[in-house]
Swiss-Prot record:
Stated family: Belongs to the acireductone dioxygenase (ARD) family.
Record site: Important to generate the dianion: 104
Residues annotated as binding Fe(2+): 96, 98, 102, 140
Any Pfam family: ARD
Keywords carried by this UniProt record: Amino-acid biosynthesis, Dioxygenase, Iron, Metal-binding, Methionine biosynthesis, Nickel, Oxidoreductase
Name of this protein: Acireductone dioxygenase
Subunit composition and interactions: Monomer.
GO molecular function: acireductone dioxygenase (Ni2+-requiring) activity; acireductone dioxygenase [iron(II)-requiring] activity; iron ion binding; nickel cation binding
Needed co-factor(s): Fe(2+); Ni(2+)
Residues where Ni(2+) binds: 96, 98, 102, 140
Keyword field contains Amino-acid biosynthesis: yes
Source domain of life: Bacteria
Organism, scientific name: Marinobacter nauticus (strain ATCC 700491 / DSM 11845 / VT8)
Keyword hit for Kinase: no
């Protein structure tokens, strides 16, 4: 279940608020410029190709490109048996920003976005059918868990703008990781 847990950065051991209602999640994130939505499920085979996935969601992707100016879309997928899963997980576990929006739609599986706003951290467990757009410049990090299992559509205005710029802050190491917040989901 999609879950938003809100932490105070000085009390990272306990969430102040936990929300599972999609409309409430949408409203809380929107207050910080983060777009959250849910798309209808599409029937896709487990081994669907990038082309099949993009075709299944062609209308939604085209709408985002038109409304938000995205130029390209691709599909990223990671499974627990990937030989570089640990390196991929580590790559985005530290707080960073991007010079363009980070947009992900979860075709299957799940992942945990942490969004740092002032003295609060919003931990959003995204699941199948969730769309999130993190505005450029937003301090955040992503945890796919020790046994990743997800497929996402990514949208870009400029893929070079998506390079992570790390903040050097240690806040990500003080918050509960995927293993704690996903609850074995």
């Amino acid at each position: 279940m999609t879950t938003l847990s809100i932490f105070h950065q000085n009390q990272p051991e306990q969430a102040q608020t936990v929300v599972t209602d999609p409309d409430t999640i949408r409203n809380k994130l929107s207050a910080h410029g983060v777009h959250f939505d849910r798309w209808a499920t599409r029937d896709l085979p487990a081994d669907a190709t990038q082309e099949e996935i993009l075709e299944a969601y062609a209308d939604e992707v085209a709408r985002l490109k038109q409304d938000w100016g995205f130029q390209t879309a691709d599909v990223v997928s990671l499974t627990a048996d990937h030989p570089q899963k640990d390196a991929f997980r580590q790559k985005f576990l530290d707080e960073h920003t991007h010079s363009e929006d980070e947009v992900r739609f979860f075709v299957r599986g799940q992942g945990l976005f942490y969004l740092h706003f002032g003295d609060q951290v919003y931990a959003l467990l995204c699941e199948k059918n969730d769309l999130i757009s993190v505005p450029d410049g937003t301090r955040h990090w992503f945890d796919m868990g020790p046994e990743p299992e997800f497929t996402c559509i990514r949208l870009f205005s400029n893929p070079e703008g998506w390079v992570a710029s790390f903040t050097g802050e240690d806040i990500a190491s003080r918050l509960p990781r995927y293993e704690s917040l996903a609850g074995g989901a």
